[in-house]
């Protein structure tokens, strides 16, 4: 167990805005050690009253949409305007190849050196649920440290868009200018998740970008909006030149104003918290199950038998559950 005095010191330094303390606290919540997890829960419980005041922004994008460039320029603009900006990532594949955000941190040289900015690579290893848990806790720590804008990036792998959308106030999709073929290629689910669409790289061909924006606006008309008071705007912008990023921030603030006034923002966060509670229950139960000695002793042989078709998955599951006492 980490001594209580260390947790006290870490808490005080983090609340004072110490980025090194914030990084250490995030490392603590990412740890799989049982004593570290207990300490992390203690720290988070103490800090909860200081969370919830930040604008939580999720950003995803199609390949080549210029997410890193846009996030850096957008973040720098917000810092210059007096905000404190944290950038986190959800990358369930980071345990295999290091995660794109590691490269992003290197490329975000201007933002990373800002005193009022904090960039954190995706936690490595584990399934998407575990990565999401660590990222959500990192978001709360950033808020407690005084960051009033938290940007969570998804690399767009599998269900990561849904996971990120379920921990933020507004979810942005970065797209690239294109014609009908490109429009058809965009996943409908991504468009339905987005609260705001941005046609990026508009500086290269403004007319083409505007045509794409018009196409997406038309496409949105056939979809039922997630909330009757909000139709997702479709903007054009350039992360390279900064064009349109001021309008983007204005729309984010408008979304917050509308959703706060009608109660949807509070309801969205309440629903997220309830789902988060059950996700934590599942996560803790799975950890307890997999680390139980009786279960761990059976897993290698049963996994091999299932893979080779010798034992049905349902029968193997029954044996594991019985070993756990269920």
Curated annotation (Swiss-Prot):
Binding sites annotated in the UniProt record for GTP: 61-69, 203, 238-240
Hydrolase recorded as keyword: yes
Domain of life, source organism: Bacteria
Keywords recorded for this protein, A-Z: ATP-binding, Chaperone, GTP-binding, Hydrolase, Nucleotide-binding
GO MF term (any one): ATP hydrolysis activity
A Pfam entry, by short name: MeaB
Any one Gene Ontology cellular component term annotated for this protein: cytoplasm
InterPro entries: AAA+_ATPase (IPR003593), GTPase_ArgK (IPR005129), P-loop_NTPase (IPR027417)
Entry EC number(s): 3.6.-.-
Function of the protein: May have GTPase activity. May also bind and hydrolyze ATP. May function as chaperone.
UniProt record similarity statement: Belongs to the SIMIBI class G3E GTPase family. ArgK/MeaB subfamily.
Protein name: Putative GTPase CC_2483
Species: Caulobacter vibrioides (strain ATCC 19089 / CIP 103742 / CB 15)
